[in-house]
C-alpha cells in the first residue's frame, strides 16, 4: 500500500470532500437541526457539534476536536492516516469527486 501521497491529493481530500457527504457514506449518525449539522463525535460520543463549511471542518464542542475529512475518517474507522487516505481516494474515485 502506497504511503506517499501528492500535496494535490491531500489538499483535494481535505477541501473538496464534503463532510456531510462523507458522514452519509460512512453511515455515521448525523442530522440537521436549525441549520446546524449535528453528528456523533467519533472521539467522545457526544453530539455537541457543528460544521464550518468555509473551512470544511466539523467541530465537537464537547471534546474541543476539529475534524477535516481525513481526520474524521481516521477516527470513525479507527485507522491510521495512510488507510484513511486510501479509503477516501477509493470512495472519491467511485463517486467521481476528483
Label the predicted regions:
Residues 1-98:
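N-terminal structured subdomain of primase-like DNA metabolism proteins
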Amino acid at each position: 500500500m502506497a504511503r506517499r501521497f501528492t500535496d494535490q491529493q491531500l489538499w483535494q481530500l481535505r477541501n473538496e470532500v464534503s463532510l456531510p457527504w462523507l458522514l452519509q457514506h460512512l453511515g455515521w449518525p448525523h442530522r440537521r437541526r436549525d441549520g446546524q449539522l449535528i453528528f456523533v463525535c467519533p472521539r467522545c460520543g457526544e453530539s455537541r457539534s457543528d460544521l464550518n463549511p468555509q473551512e470544511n471542518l466539523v467541530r465537537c464542542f464537547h471534546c474541543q476536536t476539529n475534524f477535516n475529512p481525513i481526520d474524521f475518517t481516521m477516527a470513525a474507522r479507527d485507522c491510521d492516516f495512510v488507510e484513511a487516505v486510501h479509503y477516501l481516494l477509493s470512495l472519491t474515485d467511485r463517486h467521481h469527486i476528483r
